[in-house]
From Swiss-Prot:
Belongs to the LpxB family. Signal peptide: none annotated. It catalyses: a lipid X + a UDP-2-N,3-O-bis[(3R)-3-hydroxyacyl]-alpha-D-glucosamine = a lipid A disaccharide + UDP + H(+). This is Lipid-A-disaccharide synthase 2. Pfam families: LpxB. One of its GO terms (cellular component) is membrane.
Amino acid sequence: MIKKRQTRIAMIAGEMSGDLLGAGVIRELKKHLKNVEFIGVGGPQMLEEGFQSLANMSELSVMGISDVLRRYPQLYFIRERLLKEWTINPPDVFIGIDYPDFNLSVETRLKRQNVKTVHLVSPKVWAWRQKRVYLIKKAVDLVLTLFPFEESFYQQYDVPAQFVGHPLADLIEINPNNADLRKKYNYKPDDTILAVLPGSRIGEIKYIGPLFLEVMQRIAVEMPHVHFIVPIACQELYPVFFKQFQARYSHLKIQIIQGNAREAMAISDVVLTKSGTATLEAMLLKRPMVVAFKWSKFTHAIIAPQVKIPYVALPNLLANKKLVPEFVQEKATANSITESVLNLLACPSQSNLNKQFTAIHHTLRQNANEKAALSILKILETSSA
């Protein structure tokens, strides 16, 4: 039986996607636990569910090795402050949401203190630095995976893991109808729209923002009738992108909005996005896309030799074949990306692609938040036994 005293659940989300996942799990856990406290680090979505954040989530947001090295003292201070708090007043369970390097170090320390640990969202050990699986095995009591191939990977190493599905697959309809949304953004039904997503971190926008602006400029020349909508993930990122826009591209007619990335993709004909969760959302919305990724040469030189996967776009990884065009690092040029986007804009109706996207959608639609919450409740029961 779960203890009648207040249940204390510690969580850390390091970025916007983790905040969204954390909020969903909190919502489900509250249905089962009436006297519960959620503490740690989270963003606005988790805060809306009653989460108490002990640090600003944006302080944890880093991209690439150089950014980690530069901000290591700050990250170290936050981690040690949290661990001190949880040593004095241990949680019943700790849930690390993605953000693996930081969360695994916290999980390792807490597990030594007999705190139950769950990691939600598998670190990409199947992609690179595979030896981390042995650290994960020591650090966590359970890994909750969003994709089926991840559960199979962990089974090879006897790591407790459960595929719970992806919350976005539950949230987004199998056959979405987004015609009415166009009115909200003052677009006509027959307008051709390109949604452009340059990233959700400062480091991503630094490298990808200028590239995507150059692509938009070239598309505007070739297809002047195309409308551009650019959702910026949060308020802190807006001035970063706007400065890039003002520097050389202020003549472009771009609708820049704060947040609402899913709506921007939903009303679009084609999506241009950096790799990451946005590629999954675009797939679930059944939108053809072009995917690009770029980071510092220093980070790329260190990480690239360790990468063990043929693709970076999630639709390609889930299908185990190239469904959507993707361009990484030196291949991510304005010429190559523009050509691919123009091809899709010329023929946005992709019935075969839509069928494959739909099949993957069904696989991922598992009522993920509920499955994750039930797994966490089982862990709580063992901790209180």
